[in-house]
Amino acid sequence: MGLHWQWLIWALVGLHVALATKWYGGGMDFNDPTAWLDDHLPCAQDLVVFPEYYPALLPLPEDISIDGLVFPREGAILLAEESTITFGSDKQPSCESDENKAYLKPPKSSKWFDPGTWTDKSKEFSTFTPELERIPCDDEQVIIKGHGPLAFDLENVQYLRLGQLILAGSSISKTYLEQLISRDLGQFLFYNAEYVQVEYYRGELCGCHKDFERLLEPVCHNVQEQCETPHCLSPVRPLGSCCLICGAILSTPTTHCTEGSRKELVAQISNLISQESLKDQIGLHVEFVGSQKFGNCLQAVVTDRHKYSERSLEFLQQNEHNWNKTGTTLKVSGRPYNPNVSFSSIVLILFCMALVGLVSVVILAHFMPENPYLNRIPQWIHDPRLWRWRHLGLRLRRNLLFNRFDNGGAEGGSSEGGASGVDRLGIMAYDPESGEVRERAFDNPMFEQGGALEEAAKESQEQDEILSVPKMETGDLDARSVVDEQELTEINLETCEADTDEETI
């Protein structure tokens, strides 16, 4: 009886290992138009031309019909046992080309520790699934299939740990994989594989990886830029995850990583979610996490499926008594918030709204002068006396720029030297035709009154008459004129002396 139970346990373990499979279907397939230049698939009369340097392994399809192959200087192709290549077949009217050549595009490599390289057909990865569970686990089966170029970058890979490797339909053993990596063919299939050690495991591990903390840095190096900013305060990071999330984490230490204990916790939490009708609102992920340094634990990640609203946090806190065990820890994130909206952005938005409102009011005041409230705004803008903020120490210049345009002859004006544009600001212009005093304009210095024009014309005429008087002729004085001048001077002196004597008497 005990023997039957032992066989049953091993069968269940084998079933679990078989279901845990990572698939690689990346690369552009040989029969995909995107793998060729100008999206031109090779016809039966076409010559297939490889790039000069083709750093990849290309598995050719089982049956192709072409005119020939131009191999690269460096590269590799893989032919299956049942593959058939037909050269020089008949032309097909539906497939013709002018050049009779088809050019393959250069291949692209995929990183082994990149979660985007692998898929799991047995389950769908959610946004809160740890990144270390999206790459091949240490005991998982890895299937590499397809007819596209194969090239894997083993950057930061120290141990290539697998459960089983199936390449192009063939199972690859640990010994053959070690030999393949060291050969020339393996250098096209695996980059940076000089010091990589190959290890195979068969389900004897706890969790996805043997030491998850050693893989965090190389794996997160490939996905760190893809992490979204969490919309909550104090986000949490599950074990084996590179990105912070909003939700709750329930961790229970364990010594035996059995599938039964994991399913028991999954069923317990799922039943509570169904009882509260939260299946469409709350997401759940339960998995073992193993570490030689920190020990093993069973981790349950509970998050909101849609926008974070603390529903997952409330659910775990309300039902905490259902799984209250020794050593169980609960980590929760804070309240939701939008990280894209900060205090400075709010202030900027309010300032822009106030500025738009102010400009709108000024425009309305300009086009609605009859409004009893809006018509005061232009006066407030043009009146500098309202701009004196004594408590700020600001003063307005008294020598205004347009003082020379003030009408000094208008009524109410001041012609005294002490007057200024600020004192006579009520009168800024005078309209000579209507006799109105304009308070929102200035005099045009080129515009004069009628009387002023006549007076200016009269002054101009008098000046012309003065300029028209003939000038006196001048010439050199001769000796006779000099003698006459001396005689006149003597007569004047004698007359002055006689007058002086009479005054003395």
Swiss-Prot record:
GO molecular function, one term: cargo receptor activity
Locations listed in the record: Cell membrane
Protein name, per record: Protein amnionless
Topological category with respect to the lipid bilayer: Single-pass type I membrane protein
Record's signal peptide: 1-20
Extracellular-side positions: 21-344
Lineage, broadest ranks: Eukaryota, Metazoa, Ecdysozoa, Arthropoda, Hexapoda
Keywords, alphabetical: Cell membrane, Membrane, Protein transport, Signal, Transmembrane, Transmembrane helix, Transport
Amino acid composition bias (Basic and acidic residues), ranges on this chain: 473-482
Main location: membrane
Pfam family, any one: Amnionless
Ranges per topology, Cytoplasmic: 366-505
GO BP: clathrin-dependent endocytosis; nephrocyte filtration; protein localization; protein transport; receptor-mediated endocytosis; renal protein absorption
Function of the protein: Required in the nephrocyte for normal uptake of proteins and elimination of toxins, and for maintenance of endocytic trafficking structures. May function together with Cubn.
Tissue spec. comment: Specifically expressed in nephrocytes.
Organism encoding this protein: Drosophila melanogaster
Region (Disordered): 451-482
Transmembrane annotation, as ranges: 345-365
GO CC terms in record: apical plasma membrane; endocytic vesicle; membrane; receptor complex
InterPro entries, alphabetized: AMN
